[in-house]
Amino acid sequence: MGRWNPDAEGRLRAAALELFVERGYELTTVADIAERAGLTARTFFRYFADKREVLFNGSARLQQLMVETVNSAPKNVTAMGAVTAAVLATSEFFVDNRDFACRRSSVIAAHAELRERELIKLANLSRSLAEALNRRGVLEPDASLAAEAGIAIFRIAFDLWVQNAERRELGEIVHDLLARLKGFSVEA
């Protein structure tokens, strides 16, 4: 009998991404992913609802991190300050996963179904941030405006960060984009 290998979820994620890059998303089946990982399809479904979720299963943890960051921001911090802290917290979330994030991003970019899923996840994240700001006493439309601005910064920073030529850390890119955004609001 073979030796049990730990981290089934990680092995499934790695196998899925390898296969999505090698064969394409549409041509990869759950059975293919499980076989590559040395597991069964049944084991796959213990971790993921479907093959799309392999690419999106970190969304709940990311959302929790960002909402908790907004919730724990000091009371005197502005709505945008709390959202900025949440966006900056994402750099720690992704620090050890740059290679996975780069390959994941290219797979998503190549498939309309996955791009749509990504947009839905970002919209949910924005809504959660706005709700967290509401709980802090920030009224609408300010809460939604700050949340949407934060998600725009996050999305653009992430898109820049996963480019092969980009060498800066995610947090550095976020700071740069925030400075650019502030520059837009200065009247000439």
Feature map (PLM): residue ranges:
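Basic, helix-initiating cap at the start of DNA-binding domains
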Residues: M1-R23, L27-L39, F56, L65, ...
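Short hydrophobic/aromatic patch on the recognition helix
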Residues: L39-F48
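Hydrophobic alpha-helical connector segments
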Residues: Q64-R104
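Hydrophobic alpha-helical bundle segments that form small-molecule/ligand-binding pockets
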Residues: D96, L122-A147
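Small/polar (Gly/Ser/Thr/Ala-rich) solvent-exposed segments
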Residues: E118
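C-terminal peripheral helix-coil segments that are non-catalytic and often amphipathic
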Residues: E131, E166-A188
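Hydrophobic alpha-helical segments that form the core
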Residues: E140-L160, I173-L181
